[in-house]
Every structure is written in structure tokens, then in C-alpha cells.
Amino acid sequence: MLNLDSKNIRFLARMGARGTLGQVVYDYLKDERDLYVVTADLMHASGFDRVKKDFPERLVNVGIAEQNLIGVSAGLARYGSPVIATSWAMFTSVRVADQVRNYMGYMQSNVKLIGMDSGFIQSEFSYSHTNPPDIAIMRTIPGIKILSPCDGTEIYKAVVSAIEYKGPVYIRLTGDTLMPIVYKDATYNYEIGKANILKKGNEIAIIATGNIVKNGLDAADLLKDQLDCTVIDMHTIVPLDATLLQELKHYKLIVTVEEHLKAGGLGSAIAEYYAAEAVKPRHIILGVDDIYTPSGTTGYVQEQVGLSSRQIAERIIKEFRS
């Protein structure tokens, strides 16, 4: 496997989410580990060119047939090998929800479904491909872990952890090439279900997931002379880190940030958790309202829906002082 030193951390950041996926899958197979790879006509986009060249017997391309992607992957997994399955996040959630529910969730198949280009990264292709409600859909299917890594280093660790976990996993990949680096030191511990505290404060907790974790960090930096913020990378949405959420109960304000609809996403999951608690913090959810997001670059769409670092900081100040 790749040595995640400072040089390779920068390398993964330059490759982006899809390139990192291809790298970790290739490294896993190169180490002679057991794995099958299935894709829905996205071999190149998934970074699997070297996999096809060096391990053709381990790669299946089902074509533009996402429902079949899930069925074939679940079938392969029945023979005992873990399976990586890839397509665009809009299609791995909305289009195949029936198959995911039956063949992954109910059957507990050892399939790791990768939703590529989740969030706003495909906004230039219009709404048919962008801002999929993937967290919301996957949260309604019992028995599936949901991972949402924030940078190249964490994608690498998350994919390895998912492969080695026996059972169905959904990984949503957000961000493009030249991803911002959140983890400059890869020696940190990545554990499914265990969130990471990136910055420690005692007044406000910013909880983010996916590539927008960097916006949360930058917002906290903008506020450093006014408010004391904790910043948390909630890389696992199912299961949530309940231990950490208990520790945050006495914070003055919790702010969840996500490139996802407010309905059914990370903020909803955390609100549902606190609904059963007698003592709970004030909580605001920053995400996409009940709208169709516009076309444009990721930065443009973030600005339009209030998720730039500056807008996050401004909203926190407004809520904290109200």
C-alpha cells in the first residue's frame, strides 16, 4: 500500500477523489489482496485504467446499467470476495435504491458502493448529475455504513477500512482534482464510526462532512478572534459517533455543514440523535434548502446556497448573537 508521507499526501490531493480511488484500489490488488471491482461504464473516470491493464480478471464493466451494477456486485460478493462498485453518486443512490435495499442492505452483501462526484462537483452538468440526496436515501436502508471522507488521505484510509469491513458500505466522494489538504499528517487514526476533532474549542462546534470540512476549518479561522470553535470531521454518518455527540451536549451552539439537502443529511441525523436527549445544544443545519441547485462551479454553487467559508462564519456570528 502507499506510504502516506507528506509527498504522497500532496500526490493524492493533486489526483483528487477519483484518482485517489483508483490508486488505493490498484495498491490493494497489487499487494495480492482479494478484491473484485465492478463499474458502470466509468472505468477511466474511476481511475481504473491500471487495474484493467494489470488485473483484468478482477474488473467487470457492466456498461451504463447501474441496476445491474448492484446485482452483479452482490452476486460476486456471494463467492466470498469483497467488491468495489462505482458510478456517479446520483445514480448509485436515486437510480438504484431498490437494488441497494434488496441486494446490499437486506442480503448484507460485502459490497462497497462508491458514489463518485457527490455534492456540487458536477454542477456544470446541470441538476441531473449534481447534489444527489445520497445520504438521505442510504440512511433509510438498514444495515449500510455510510462514509464521507474529506480529502485524499482520508479517502485512501476510508476505502481500505471499507474493504476490510465485512458488510455493505456506501462511500460518497466529494471534491475535484487539487483537493484541499485537511490531514497534513497521515498518522492519525481512521476508524469507522469515530469522528475526528480537527480543532478544539469550547463554545461552538462546527461538524462537517466531505470536502466541505475545509470550509468549516476556514470559517473557524475567520472567527478565531471572536469565537472559540471546535471543528469536527464527521467522516462516518452511519453510525454516528454517539460518544462525541454526548460530549458536545453542553456547547452553546452546534453547526452542521454539508453539500447535501438539509432534509435527510448529516444535520438531520444529528438532530434525530439529540431529539431523544433531555439536555441538548442549540443546533443549526447549513446545507441545501428545498431547491434545485443552480449550474456552475463548486465555489459558485456554495456561494448561492450559503456554504462558502465566509458565509458559514457570518451565519455563526448571527446565530450566536441572536
Q: Which role does the model predict for each range below?
A:
Residues 1-172, 177, 189, 304, ...:
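Thiamine diphosphate
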